[in-house]
């Protein structure tokens, strides 16, 4: 009984201790939950701030990428425009080439037709000698053709103006490209400023993020310290829990001892019950004996009478010890019942306390398990947060590295762009200088060409005046021929003097023209030498072509002048000794008779006409050289026929035809050279424009 009371008191004291520990544990757990929730909210806020910063950076990068895509699209559009412009230029060049081919075909066709006519005329002149009227009609027809050629030369002049307009348009395009380059430079400067501003803002953001990282590190360190403190507290709680468990084990041992006592009491109770049963059986046997005795009494009175004393004695003998035993048994039964009731009450109370203690133990164990799980979860969250922080640190380091690499790349690109812009500025300046020099050269050449054109116009006006004078002289000669028979009284000496004066006048005019031709030729040679110094590569094939044309022209001339050796000799040396040829042409006139002189004067007029015609056709291209030579050959054949028609001593004619053909060749070469230089200048401008476009595309 004393052991049971001590166990109950111990259980009561242990139950109070458990309730106080439970309250402390609950308070600690609440504090831990509050701190963990607070730290979790702080970490979530920090992670959210970092995510927002990263989102902002991503948006800025996307905006920059979109701007770069727009710039790439603009560059592609500019490429397309440049390609379209080049295609249009190529198409225009092809059209011009086709037009030139058509003109060359027309010229070749005219050449063939002219050769056919020339052959036909040669056959007619060789077969039959026609009159002067036919010659004049032929000359008029040829003058018409020369007028046509003059119209074509005007067309060529228009085409030259078109080329000049193209040059001006190319110059305007170059200026537009220069303006575009300036605009692109301004855009690059703006982009550079934007990049610098973005760099400054990104540096400030990086500093801000670094400060945030330092703060987060400080908070993490504080959290780690707090977690260590909580771990220490949890270890203390674990120690208290272990003490509680030890107390619980002691209480369980006490319960086992009480159970053993209960088992002993139950065994005593069983023994008491067995003794009670034996006593009850003994009492029943006594009662049965009493009943038997009553029956025996009823059976026989004798026996009842005889043995009353014996029965009484026996009953006394049996009752005196039986009553003591019964009293003892009854007292033991009462005590056992009371002790049993007390034990049952104690057992019920102990069972209730055991149930409450087991429930509290289970609750504490569950709470401990929950706390363990929460601690594990906290450790897992802490590890996750650490991994996330490490990842964020790595991402920030990667972002810093990428940003630094991007900044270095941008700096390199900006430096490269500045170098390229500097080089492009240098090239643009050099191109501007070269273009200005070319413009100056073109202006000087145009001025020279205009001066030459003015000189040629003056020469043409002089030739027209000479033509009119020759026509007037031919009319006078015709009148003299017609009135020769009527004016027989006029002396032969006067006619010779008048004719010699006219011839001397013509010779002086021819000499003046030759001097003008020599001066223009020297100027042309000087201009061609200057052009050769500047553009030797362009003029070499032209000179070779002109030499080929010249050789091709000299061969038929030698063939056509095979009847007169003196004429071919004069043709070969006509350019070098014009004065001697004119004197040679004058001497036979002075020696010849008077009727022949009247026939020679129209020939001299016809000789002066082709020179005029050939002077008028100085601006034609090099394709017409053979036509002009054939024309001079036809005129020489006409003069041969006229000399045969005179029938007395063939007189040599003036070498003005050969000089004029030579001058026409040189003028045609000069015009061809000018056209080639214009084409070369246009090609140079195209190459410069393509070069600037390539530079722009390379920069973009």
Curated annotation (Swiss-Prot):
Primary localisation category: cytoplasm
GO CC term (a single one): centriolar satellite
Coiled coil: 73-283, 343-533
Region Disordered, annotated ranges: 570-603
Modified residues (N-acetylmethionine): 1
Biased composition (Low complexity): 593-603
Free-text description of this protein's post-translational modifications in UniProt: Polyubiquitinated via 'Lys-48'-linked ubiquitin, leading to its degradation. Deubiquitinated by USP36, promoting its stabilization.
One GO MF term: K48-linked deubiquitinase activity
Keywords: Acetylation, Cell cycle, Cell division, Coiled coil, Cytoplasm, Cytoskeleton, DNA damage, Mitosis, Phosphoprotein, Ubl conjugation
Xref: PANTHER family: CENTROSOMAL PROTEIN OF 63 KDA, SARCOMA ANTIGEN NY-SAR-24/CYTOSKELETAL PROTEIN SOJO
Function: Required for normal spindle assembly. Plays a key role in mother-centriole-dependent centriole duplication; the function also seems to involve CEP152, CDK5RAP2 and WDR62 through a stepwise assembled complex at the centrosome that recruits CDK2 required for centriole duplication. Reported to be required for centrosomal recruitment of CEP152; however, this function has been questioned. Also recruits CDK1 to centrosomes. Plays a role in DNA damage response.
Protein family membership: Belongs to the CEP63 family.
UniProt miscellaneous comment: CEP63 and DEUP1 paralogs are both involved in centriole amplification: while CEP63 mediates mother-centriole-dependent centriole duplication, DEUP1 mediates de novo centriole amplification in multiciliated cells.
Protein name: Centrosomal protein of 63 kDa
